[in-house]
Amino acid sequence: MKENIYDKKSYDLDTSAQLVFNYIKKKFGKREECICFYQEPRYLTQYGFVPSLVVLDREYGIIIFKTYDYKDGDIYYMGEDSWIVKGERIANQLDYLEDYEYELKNDLFRPVNKLKPSMLSINSFIIFPFLNSDTIEQLDETIQDAIENNQILFSDFNIVLNKLESSKMLKENEWKMLRSVIQKANGLSKSLGIKIKEPVKNLRDAITLNENKIYLLDEEQLDAAMTLNNGCERIRGLAGTGKTIVLSMKAARLHALYPDAKILYTFYTQSLYKQINRLVSIFYKKLTGEDLNVDNQNLKIMHAWGGKIKKGVYSEMCKKINVKPLSYYDMRFEKDPFGKACSKLIDKNLTEEYDYILIDEAQDLPVEFFKLICKISKKPYNIVWAYDELQTTGDVKIPEPDELFGKDEYGKAKISLKRDNDHILKKSYRNNIRVLFLAICLGFGIYSKKGIVQMIDKEETWRALGFKLDDGVLKYGNNVIIERPEKNSPMNIQSYYDKYNVLNYNLFDTKSEELDFISNKIITLVKEESVKEEDIIVIDLNSKSAESNLKYIQRVLFKNEIGSMIPGFVDGVDDFFVEGRVTLTTSRRAKGNEAPIVFVLGIENLYTTMNRINDKINRNLAFIAITRAKGWCFITASGEKANLFEEEYYEIFSKFPRMEFKYPTEKEMDEIGKINYMTSNDEILKTSYENKETFLKFISQDPEMLKALLNDDEKEKILKYLERLND
């Protein structure tokens, strides 16, 4: 039996639930297809009723328990209208239980779930494990009937429960649906109520079928989303493992349970605003039956930095202490613009404002921001941060809490992370295994002729990401084999519709041919395959030419009566996935978003420079772009470098699903470390590498970067540049 006790603080004080739970473990403990929830699932009942324990069993159905810790002499009277407990009149608790059971059945037996009352039995009990029935002075006829019918049990409750009999065994799909409903996961469904028959006839139906499939949170995701503890939590996982979903569910759950608590949800990518708001709203309504009030000041969803129009955590801090917020433009010559801006507030008197703080995309935020978060968090620092080791231009390493939040005057970490609160999400549900495998091999440069640009140095970290070391030891210069088990990438959308490979690439002689191919393919998908425009995203890997390339595609689509948008160039930066419009963008703007169909434009950009720093950046951008695909991925390249991608592609998949390579030598790892240092800030590099003068001015102010850059071959050359620049 799986034990899902998420609110451990409450359970530790709930002696009556503990007693009944110990009995349940004896009766159901050895059953594999059985789950016991504590105070779950919750519904917005008229009386705010919460069950003590709910057992979900594939053969026994659903068993609901409400336990009370009343003892002999506590209850004087139990009647149909009210009870007298400890000298006070309270409502008949059977009404509460029946109200809850009614809401549960309404949720279970909605037509979309395809569950019927005849499929499973539902039993519910009120239990007084510390009370003998003969100590109650008065019982009216209604309550006596309930006792005789075993709805109300007392200290001898085990006698009745031992007689519980199993019912009809649920089918596998019914059991999966039952768990999904109880876990609230089907609140994510974007189904329009359209029934799709298999086999599907076009790509749109395949997308709809995939979205209508049950999204069942796995144990790691469910534990991360539902657990409530005092103190901090960390959530780790690859792209597509559900980190944003988990944080959104946690935010909705906290707001539903503690409406007066101050909750902050912050993130790095501006285009995530709509997605996070949508997810939190879906889960909140699922939990409470009410629409989320987006203007509620107790739940704030804000960008980390903020801007002229959008509020941000940093900008709001500044306003509260009458300090002018610094913009990226103000800090553009700093190595870490946002970190430097945050550092100017660290010594200021900031108010401990929030009871709970949730941080998405933690890998992209500077340490100084976390120190500010610590200052605005109330004790015991209920801070949850989600981290993706591979979606950062910096080092593939997760900083520990003492690095993020600092130490106290005694040298101890201000915030400690308990092992049970370090959640690892291994399974990637967004990306097909081939898509994810290609993204990682390209992103790390596993088979790049220029050499590996990024590496994970611990087997434990590889395992945490859902890989396994098949052969070798992670030591300098060793031959190693690392595999991605298929079970950790279960998404297989191509099985619904195999007209297109889930992963495609096309090479062209000229850029115009490449752009025409993408434009025409989109036209075909929309007009012949009935794909919705908002289900398509085009990502250009070359930021220099992105605006002109994307506008070209936009013009072609417009002529064919297909709407599109270009966030940041033509439209607002967070305008993603608007109904009836294809999204045309860059990797940096696409970060954090996803789409059923992704076009990755200009993959030859990986091979246009021999500079190792740019190589690392370009490969990371390719990783981000490819992993946006939660369905089909179309990759294109043009020009004389295009064939280099094809060569690397074939080498990657000749070993699939295993990566066979030589682990970097000590010298190579040192070089990778230098590259990581020099690519540790995405924003400054985005500007600097496109402007040599800006870049040289930037590195002239950073001795560590100069040290990393000035190898024997380039030292003289770069020094001369700097001398001319400073004249």
Q: What are the language-model segments listed below?
A:
Residues 98-110, 619-633:
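Metal-dependent nuclease catalytic cores in nucleic-acid-processing enzymes
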Residues 111, 119, 169, 321-368, ...:
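ATP-hydrolysis module of ASCE/P-loop NTPase motor domains
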Residues 184-231, 238, 246:
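N-terminal pre-P-loop "Q-motif" helix
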